[in-house]
Regions:
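Nucleotide-sugar donor-binding/catalytic module of glycosyltransferases
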Residues: 1-160
Length: 160
């Protein structure tokens, strides 16, 4: 395992049935220099068992999977706990009903490498798509955009 450059952080509440889909999309990543932290926000389903099964089947190689449990307090508290446990230089929040295209970790890291010395930039984001590949929202640019949230909304007409 190479160094952990990216932490993929998933807050989960009663999403045991959805977590294997994320896991499969993470297994397909072309860049495996990441960890996956799952923060269980007080689930009452089989989340702990599902994560344990994924951890057991994944022991030999690949990215580490960390499971943290906390009493229900809302997604924001789960994210905060996960960030404290993160080992990556970057943190990518991946919702429990999402999945990533196979080059996502590589793409995010490549973008970060281009801007990492710029202290004005605090994050990297990209397009979202439906599972069938249709883009959510509208196309803005082929290249990088240096903009704050107001510019994205009013100059580039990006809806949140």
């Amino acid at each position: 395992m190479d160094e952990i450059r990216v932490t993929i952080l998933t807050a989960s509440y009663n999403r045991a049935k959805l977590l294997p889909t994320i896991y499969k999309s993470l297994q397909r990543q072309t860049d495996q220099c990441f960890e996956w932290i799952i923060v269980d926000d007080g689930s009452q389903d089989d989340t702990a068992l599902v994560v344990k099964a994924m951890q057991e089947s994944h022991k030999v190689e690949g990215f580490p999977i960390t499971y943290l449990y906390k009493e229900n307090g809302g997604k924001h508290t789960a994210i905060n706990l996960g960030v404290k446990a993160a080992n990556g230089l970057l943190t990518l929040v991946l919702d429990s009903d999402d999945e990533l295209p196979e080059d996502a970790v590589h793409s995010v890291w490549t973008c970060f490498e281009q801007i990492r010395e710029n202290e004005r930039i605090g994050g990297v984001c990209g397009y979202m798509a439906h599972r069938d590949g249709r883009m959510i929202g509208r196309y803005v640019s082929d290249g990088l955009i240096d903009a704050d949230t107001r510019q994205l909304q009013y100059q580039y007409n990006v809806d949140w």
